[in-house]
């Protein structure tokens, strides 16, 4: 059994949205996306972490997943409009790559473009 993967908000604005404490990811896949509506619970049925965003959107409704694949932990762009940047490597959004293996230790994940506020640190 793999150790728990931890996801941290890497920007103060995101910490205010999701909390300053790390999110312990124990079950996979773990889907991150945009809040959909204030009329419902704001989450798509399979989204585990829903964050608010306003137009022009950086975060897609279903943006990226953190998954376990064999002995590896990977990030997979879920077909987002702006792509996902993992440790400086672009996934989706015109790139031919759609997943990246996370390294042991700290990994940087940006949902959207380089100017996106949706920046996370994932500890594997």
Task: Tell me what each language-model feature is.
Residues 48, 63-65, 70-106:
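Forkhead-associated
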Residues 1-57, 101-108, 113-124:
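Intrinsically disordered, low-complexity acidic Ser/Thr-rich regulatory segments
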Residues 55-58, 75-77:
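Short histidine-centered beta-strand/loop micro-motifs
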């Amino acid at each position: 059994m793999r150790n728990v993967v931890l996801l941290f908000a890497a920007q103060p604005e995101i910490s205010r949205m999701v909390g300053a404490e790390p999110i312990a990811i124990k079950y996979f896949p773990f889907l991150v996306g945009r809040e959909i509506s204030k009329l419902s619970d704001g989450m798509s049925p399979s989204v585990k972490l829903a964050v608010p965003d306003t137009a022009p959107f950086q975060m897609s409704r279903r943006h990226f997943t953190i998954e376990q694949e064999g002995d590896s932990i990977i990030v997979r762009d879920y077909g987002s409009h702006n792509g996902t940047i993992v440790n400086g490597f672009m996934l989706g959004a015109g790139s031919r790559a759609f997943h990246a293996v996370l390294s042991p230790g700290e990994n940087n994940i940006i949902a959207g473009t380089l100017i996106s506020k949706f920046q996370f640190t994932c500890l594997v």
